Swiss-Prot record:
Native organism: Streptococcus agalactiae serotype V (strain ATCC BAA-611 / 2603 V/R)
Start and end residues of each Core-binding (CB) domain: 16-121
Name under which the protein is recorded: Tyrosine recombinase XerS
Family annotation (CDD domains): DNA_BRE_C
Pfam families linked: Phage_int_SAM_1 (PF02899), Phage_integrase (PF00589)
Activity regulation note: FtsK is required for recombination.
Subcellular location: Cytoplasm
UniProt keyword terms in alphabetical order: Cell cycle, Cell division, Chromosome partition, Cytoplasm, DNA integration, DNA recombination, DNA-binding
Family of the protein in this entry: Belongs to the 'phage' integrase family. XerS subfamily.
A GO MF term: DNA binding
PANTHER family per record: PHAGE INTEGRASE-RELATED, TYROSINE RECOMBINASE XERC
Amino acid sequence: MKRELLLEKIDELKEIMPWYVLEYYQSKLSVPYSFTTLYEYLKEYRRFLEWLLDSGVANCHHIAEIELSVLENLTKKDMEAFILYLRERPLLNANTRQNGVSQTTINRTLSALSSLFKYLTEEVENADGEPYFYRNVMKKVSTKKKKETLASRAENIKQKLFLGNETIEFLEYIDCEYQNKLSKRALAFFNKNKERDLAIIALLLASGVRLSEAVNLDLKDINLNVMVIDVTRKGGKRDSVNVASFAKPYLANYLDIRKNRYKAENQDIALFLSEYRGVPNRIDASSVEKMVAKYSQDFKVRVTPHKLRHTLATRLYDATKSQVLVSHQLGHASTQVTDLYTHIVNDEQKNALDKL
């Protein structure tokens, strides 16, 4: 979603929110949470607050009128009723006969609510230096995680990774072969953004940064001489990330054409730009997701930018056998989340041995 449209939608949601949600929003901007994250959270709050009205838990007409005391006095049974509502409500405008949202969506909703309740009961201060209330019902609500072993997850994921030579082959396919099947109109659009698209995909494959970290890069954040980028990690922490050398020519080619191709001025600080009606803007995450899906589906299998992050992590672990190094590269505080890559690499090694 374009940044301007995203901000418009955020403003629309803010207009209907209670004052304490607006305070939460303002507080998280300073962390900083991304606008995309805050937009998703606001949508979850609207859904929850509307349910409070519809179910009669809150006795008012508009969600902006819901008092803090309603949240303070929510019971575990109330939250269980809300979760049941999510599980059973019909899906609207969906190409499915299934009722209810997925467990992943429910977990995301509960995570957003946990963040709000933690703010209200622990982080915010009233005039006396105390939180607005102390009773946090979300601490009594447990989430149900998808049951899947690491081995099973590794097996599912590795089919969507570009391991070994496929990393370079994917980039070369976009560079040299993808255009051969395009119409004249599609070819013109491809040629306009070819260097940028290759630079973004090469960077994701060569650094393992998150999509949000990549699109939020500014021109000053990249140093091609030492192949390092400075990113803002989750929680607002700044980090320097090494970039594999194979991405250098793609990044250099893009930087050579960036100013003239996208009509960039000094005030256009974003590294990766798009252009609409002659005006350059920071490229948005949605555009990158669609771009990665388009190229990857034509090459091998449709993947997300996050699978490119998995690809880098798996290749790095395969080369170093160091979970610590991989966790540092990905910006994780713990090596626990890198266990997945050991399973993927071990499976690859077993397959190689079976061919001997």
